[in-house]
Amino acid sequence: PWSRDQRALRARATYLHQTLGGDDWPDLSDTALKQNSDWLAPHLLGETRLSAITAEHLGAALDTILPWSRRQEIDLLLPSHFTAPSGSHVPIDYAAENGPALEIRVQELFGLDRHPSVAGGRIPLLLILLSPAHRPIQTTRDLPGFWRGSWKDVAKDLKGRYPRHVWPEDPAAAAAVTRAVVRSAVVGGAVGLAASAA
C-alpha cells in the first residue's frame, strides 16, 4: 500500500539509478524490492500478516534507504514538480515510459523560450501539451522549435475550438494563462503591457 508520494519518490530514485547514478542510487523498482526483503524486514517486527503492512511501515523503510540528505540531492537533480510560467506547480512523471514527462496546458507555458529539463539541464522533459479541456494536443522535447514550427497550425485549430481563449502568434513572448479568460480582457492587458514596455 504505497502512498502516492512514496511511489513518486521511488520513481525518481529508480530513474536516477537507471539513467544517471548507477550504484550511487538504490534501485527501488518493484522488481528490485521483491528480490530482496532485507530493506523491509527490520520495520515489520511483531507483524505476522502481510495485510498488516501499512504505508507507515513502507515509509520507515524508505527513510532508511533514502535518508533526508539523499532526498535533498534527489530534489536538486530530479524535482518532483515543474513551476510553470503561469505559477502552477505541475508534477513530473518519472515513471513514464518515454522518460520524465510533464502534462500541462499549453497556455501555462506561454512566455517560456527554452525547453524544461532536469538533472542540471541534461535531460529534457517530454512535454504533453494539453488543451484548455485537458486533452492532449501535441508532444515535444523541443518547445522553442514547437513555438517556431507547428504552433501556427495548432493555434489555428485551438482558435476554432476555444474562441474565448487567446492564442498568440508568438507564444514565447506572450503572458502565461492559468485559467479561462475572456479574450478581450487578455488582449487589453497585452496592449497595456506592450505600451508600458515601450
What kind of feature is each model-predicted range?
Residues I74-V106:
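Amphipathic alpha-helical packing elements
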